[in-house]
């Protein structure tokens, strides 16, 4: 029985520069070959004009209405970082960042590159501060670093997710105070604990040895923690029950690992797949092809296209696509007997450096898929394809139909 390999270029959609998008400019003979033998179209990850977050977009792509199931990004980050959540826990996505003396954000990612040993040193400081705050407020505070500037913070006890972010979401704005969004003791306590942790980390960061070393190297200090997306674990019907598919995900990013785990996918990683723009894909693609013998659906997440977009790096984005395609090439013969989906979770135009609401290209190859006249995978060409314009939530039912695992609607 055939299975599906689903390749997802995070933030892969883009706007043209000189008439070409990164997908159009990339030399990707394997993906284009599959596109020429399959059906193409354009995809609104959530719905037309909606600017998706990666969390809500992946929920929709996996076949779950984000307006029904989304309870905040933090819970998915925690699951992806292998932090077990209990009922009532509140989790936040965190960024390690750089602020000036006035508390104005200079860089929301502290220069983006944070070495593992630097992240570990910061984790130790935040864990110590968290323990002290926990004793003061009667809660448990858990901080875990994930990839580069990213991390997760979990509060356990009499807490509430109904508090505002401290992340201003843009450079040049001041670090925000968390405020309760409801009139409850739990929300007030949560906001107080978050604000104290934020303040105390910025104070402690002045004496961090890693920051002294970064200053000597001319790099930005890690002197702020930005919190956003406070949420709790949603109740989600497993993908095996909802779509009758055995599904696996390969991802290096905690958020995507968490969303996949929340919907009941088995989660894997691979050497070289760290969730950065410098990822090497050979082992990840090899693992994906091997897992196709065990699963109906194997999802492979590529983060680098989004990272390069946020950095405004057009050529870097092209390079990520080309490296993935090159890693895919040796397995083309095996793929021809199965289904292959290639798409994005949202557009992150290089010129904008942020998620936008336009549709992204999608292609579906399969031995029995109707072939249209599109011969190149890109935003420019896929508009002409036979899939037309679909939504993210349509993908799983479509795949289930091709695999023959869906129930008939009606008689």
What are these regions (language model features)?
Residues 1-411:
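Feature captures the catalytic ectodomains and active-site-proximal regions of enzymes
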């Amino acid at each position: 029985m055939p299975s599906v390999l689903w390749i997802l270029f995070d933030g892969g959609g883009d706007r043209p520069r000189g008439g070409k998008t990164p997908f159009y400019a990339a030399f990707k003979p394997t993906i284009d070959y599959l596109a020429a033998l399959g059906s193409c179209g354009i995809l609104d990850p959530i719905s037309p004009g909606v600017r998706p977050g990666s969390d809500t977009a992946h929920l929709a792509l996996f076949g779950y209405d984000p307006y029904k199931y989304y309870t905040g990004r933090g819970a998915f980050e925690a699951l992806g970082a292998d932090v077990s959540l209990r009922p009532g826990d509140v989790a936040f996505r965190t960024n390690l960042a750089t602020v000036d003396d006035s508390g104005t954000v200079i860089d929301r990612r502290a220069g983006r590159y944070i070495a593992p040993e630097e992240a570990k040193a910061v984790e130790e400081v935040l864990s110590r501060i968290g323990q002290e705050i926990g004793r003061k407020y009667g809660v448990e505070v858990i901080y875990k670093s994930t990839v580069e500037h990213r991390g997760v913070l979990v509060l356990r006890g009499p807490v509430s997710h109904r508090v505002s972010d401290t992340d201003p979401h843009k450079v040049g704005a001041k670090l925000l105070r968390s405020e309760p969004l409801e009139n409850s003791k739990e929300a007030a306590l949560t906001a107080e604990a978050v604000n104290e942790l934020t303040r105390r980390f910025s104070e402690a960061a002045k004496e961090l040895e890693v920051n002294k070393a970064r200053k000597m190297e001319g790099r930005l200090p890690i002197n702020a923690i930005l919190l956003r997306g406070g949420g709790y674990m949603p109740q989600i019907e497993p993908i095996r029950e909802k779509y009758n598919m055995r599904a696996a995900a390969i991802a290096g990013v905690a958020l995507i690992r968490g969303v996949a785990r929340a919907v009941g996918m088995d989660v894997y990683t691979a050497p070289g797949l760290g969730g950065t723009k410098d990822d090497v894909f050979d082992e990840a693609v090899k693992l994906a092809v091997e897992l196709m013998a065990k699963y109906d659906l194997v999802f492979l997440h590529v983060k680098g296209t989004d990272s390069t977009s946020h950095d405004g790096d057009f050529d870097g984005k092209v390079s990520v696509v080309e490296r993935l395609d090159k890693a895919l090439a040796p397995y083309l013969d095996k793929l021809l007997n199965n289904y292959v989906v290639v798409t994005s979770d949202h557009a992150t135009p290089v010129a904008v450096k942020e998620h936008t609401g336009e549709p992204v290209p999608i292609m579906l190859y399969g031995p029995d898929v109707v072939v249209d006249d599109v011969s190149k995978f890109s935003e420019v060409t896929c508009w002409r394809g036979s899939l037309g314009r679909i939504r993210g939530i349509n993908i799983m039912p479509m795949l289930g139909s091709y695999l023959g695992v869906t129930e008939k609607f009606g008689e």
